[in-house]
Amino acid sequence: MKQLYDETLTYKRRLDLAIVLYTHQLHPSIQPVMKYVDVVSLWIWTGADIQKIEDNFKKYRSLVPDKQTLLGIYMWDFGGKKELNQDFMVKQLDFAYRLYKEGQIEGMIFHCTPLVNKNLQAVEYAKEWIAKHGDEKR
């Protein structure tokens, strides 16, 4: 990672070095790598872990206090291999919205899947949420 980071420093127009991180990977062992990262895309793999979203974000910030962060928003529970409960989607988006408005994250990434036309509750809620808040500024 250091070699890649150092290489980006030689570019005429330096590109940010971004990494995908899942909440189940939040461990002190990630810290040495994080010093070479500019942007973190933070994701929750298992829908049930959305219940711990606030604690996991605090843990993330204790390990990675100063990196630009995009919060990943899944519309399907990939870890649980099932439809994401709409209540979980509401909780996930409410928390992400608050973090964004407070300046704790730079934005959100909605994982676009082949499920977006399947009339799933979480997907429909996400569509409504994006229509309502998508153009908002801090």
What kind of region is each of these model predictions?
Residues Q3-Y11, P32, Y36, K59-L63, ...:
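Alpha-helical structural signal in soluble globular domains
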Residues M1-P28, V39-L42, D66-G79, M108-T113:
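Aromatic-lined carbohydrate-recognition surfaces of secreted/lumenal glycan-active proteins
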Residues D49, L70-R138:
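Substrate-binding cleft of secreted/luminal carbohydrate-active enzymes
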Residues W43-A48:
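Short, acidic/turn-prone active-site loops that include or flank metal/cofactor-
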Residues Y22-P32, I50-S62, K91-F95:
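Alpha-helical scaffolding within the catalytic cores
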Residues K35-V37, K52, Q121:
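Alpha-helical protein-protein interaction elements
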